[in-house]
Design a protein with these regions (language model features):
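Amphipathic protein-protein interaction modules
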Residues: 64-79
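Generic alpha-helix signal with a bias toward terminal, lower-confidence helices
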Residues: 24, 28, 60-62, 76
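Short aromatic-glycine-(Arg/Gly/Cys) micro-motifs in beta-strand/loop hairpins
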Residues: 30-59
């Protein structure tokens, strides 16, 4: 099942708030910036990937099927 990005963001804000992390906006977009930043990929099989790219080259990738694992990564990386 393909997760709706808006639903994922809403779930993240609730999850982060319960863990004492306050976010004004979702920390990742869904398109690569190719400038050393990260983006989120949501795969059709339900997998989430946090991917870093720099000048078109993938430099980092973390994948999971778990929303809570994804949310923990985002809090760890951006809080």
């Amino acid at each position: 099942m393909l997760e709706d990005f808006d639903t994922l963001k809403s779930d993240f804000f609730l999850y982060a708030r319960r863990r004492g992390a306050d976010f004004d906006e979702f920390p990742l977009g869904i398109k690569p910036d190719n400038l050393g930043g990260r983006h989120l990929e949501i795969k059709a099989d339900g997998r989430f990937a946090v991917v870093g790219t720099d000048r078109g080259i993938e430099t980092e990738r973390r994948e999971t099927y778990s929303k809570s694992a994804l949310f923990n990564w985002l809090i760890e990386l951006y809080a």
